[in-house]
């Protein structure tokens, strides 16, 4: 048998190393090409390391908790063309998925070579987990082509109904331990020590760095959300039927922010030593809460996207975030961040800048309250807006003007159409 190394994937320049989180196979286990063998965690995302071939797991060189670098050998596989189940430690359990009965199309022996060819030919279109699912469920070539085409538009797992257990495997129980079970101090306090994930450590470092290295200030305003609420109520059903996605509030804010950034270019910029660098593009980071912590994937060139495209992108980020499948590249860059504490019920907050960006907009809960309009008291659905910014680059005049610009657009969205 030929030994094949299991390697750490190439990591971006901004990522120096990763931590081995969980081995899904033991030494002696049978592995198949594209099986998820081990999970590793970087400062930003969780990565699945898949088997490069069929064979038997020969050795584990880097155990859970070890720090590894790009292209480092994690373990070795004894490659074989045919894997005998009696040679491995694996127990074979047959499962029946009722959801797949109508969609699964079983292949014949003659079709297997064609399927392998299609998988290889479409390697760049399918992630390891996608290729693994195709093999597990014996999808035939016609259905595979349908999956490849459709997966460009929607979530792959929704098409072939892949078992949900896989997306819930990484729960980080390995990172949780009790330093001393029922450890008690002099005051009889019971404690439980929990090790921080790498993502949480990185978040802590970046937040502290932001506070210590920026002259951060927060300005507040409020916006009447009734026009947007009525707009969603009037066109929401037609929008969903046409675009197959619900229209939320975030796409309105993305559009409003882009227009405001065009009017206040110093907010779409950053400081590089003694220079101010102005962005020409509009890459908007959207804060998303995941089981591992807060991440900010980037909607690139958002100014060229429709409302539907923005909503689909946000939905895709949310699904991938919950499944720990956000790609590293999707988190890199970004000129300006929008965060919505309102989904948790936050009435007001002071969001922290996401360096090297110079500003972040905080959305909050929509709450009906009395407001004086033209000398009359009205009950309106109001939202507080918060703009945290680096005072080294942005003055109070620009920050207030930026918020008022967003407020005016949201209260009269027709401004977007006529560019005012």
UniProtKB/Swiss-Prot annotation:
Location of N6-lipoyllysine modifications: 44
Cited Gene3D superfamilies: 2.40.50.100, Chloramphenicol acetyltransferase-like domain (3.30.559.10)
Pathway annotation: Amino-acid degradation; L-lysine degradation via saccharopine pathway; glutaryl-CoA from L-lysine: step 6/6
GO MF: dihydrolipoyllysine-residue succinyltransferase activity
Pfam families from the UniProt entry: 2-oxoacid_dh (PF00198), Biotin_lipoyl (PF00364)
Assigned protein family: Belongs to the 2-oxoacid dehydrogenase family.
Subunit annotation: Forms a 24-polypeptide structural core with octahedral symmetry. Part of the 2-oxoglutarate dehydrogenase (OGDH) complex composed of E1 (2-oxoglutarate dehydrogenase), E2 (dihydrolipoamide succinyltransferase) and E3 (dihydrolipoamide dehydrogenase); the complex contains multiple copies of the three enzymatic components (E1, E2 and E3).
Protein name per Swiss-Prot or TrEMBL: Dihydrolipoyllysine-residue succinyltransferase component of 2-oxoglutarate dehydrogenase complex
Species annotation: Buchnera aphidicola subsp. Acyrthosiphon pisum (strain APS)
Gene for this chain: sucB
């Amino acid at each position: 048998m030929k030994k094949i190394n299991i390697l750490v994937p190439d990591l971006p320049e901004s990522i120096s190393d990763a931590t081995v989180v969980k081995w899904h196979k033991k030494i002696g286990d049978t592995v198949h090409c594209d099986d998820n063998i081990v999970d590793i965690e970087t400062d930003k995302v969780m990565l699945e390391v898949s088997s490069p071939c069929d064979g038997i797991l020969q050795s584990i060189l880097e155990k859970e908790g070890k720090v590894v670098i790009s292209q480092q050998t994690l373990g070795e596989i004894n490659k074989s063309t045919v894997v005998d189940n009696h040679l491995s430690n694996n127990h074979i359990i047959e499962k029946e998925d009722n959801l797949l009965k109508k969609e699964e199309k079983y292949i014949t022996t003659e079709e297997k070579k064609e399927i392998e060819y299609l998988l290889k030919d479409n390697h760049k279109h399918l992630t390891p987990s996608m290729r693994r699912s195709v093999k597990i469920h014996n999808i035939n070539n016609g259905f595979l082509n349908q999956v490849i085409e459709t997966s460009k538009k929607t979530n792959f797992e929704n098409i072939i109904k892949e078992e949900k257990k896989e997306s819930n495997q990484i729960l980080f129980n390995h990172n949780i331990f009790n330093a001393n079970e029922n450890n008690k101090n002099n005051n009889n306090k019971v404690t439980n020590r929990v090790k921080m994930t790498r993502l949480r450590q990185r978040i802590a470092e970046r937040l502290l760095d932001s506070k210590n290295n920026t002259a951060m200030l927060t300005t507040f305003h409020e916006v009447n959300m009734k026009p947007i609420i009525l707009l969603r109520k009037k066109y929401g059903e037609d929008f969903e039927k046409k675009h197959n996605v619900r229209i939320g509030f975030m796409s309105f804010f993305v559009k409003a922010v882009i227009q405001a950034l065009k009017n206040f270019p110093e907010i779409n910029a950053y400081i590089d030593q003694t220079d101010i660098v102005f962005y020409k593009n509009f890459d908007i980071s959207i804060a998303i809460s995941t089981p591992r912590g807060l991440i900010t994937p980037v909607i690139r060139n958002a100014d060229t996207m429709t409302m539907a495209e923005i909503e689909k992108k946000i939905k895709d980020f949310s699904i991938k975030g919950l499944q720990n499948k956000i790609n590293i590249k999707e988190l890199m860059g970004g000129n300006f961040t929008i965060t919505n504490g309102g989904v948790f019920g936050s009435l007001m907050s002071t969001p922290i800048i996401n360096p090297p960006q110079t500003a972040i907009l905080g959305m909050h809960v929509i709450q009906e309250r009395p407001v004086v309009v033209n000398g009359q008291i009205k009950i309106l659905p109001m939202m507080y807006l918060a703009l945290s910014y680096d005072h080294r680059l942005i003055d109070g005049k620009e920050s207030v003007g930026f918020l008022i610009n967003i407020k005016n657009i949201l209260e009269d969205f027709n401004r977007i159409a006529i560019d005012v």
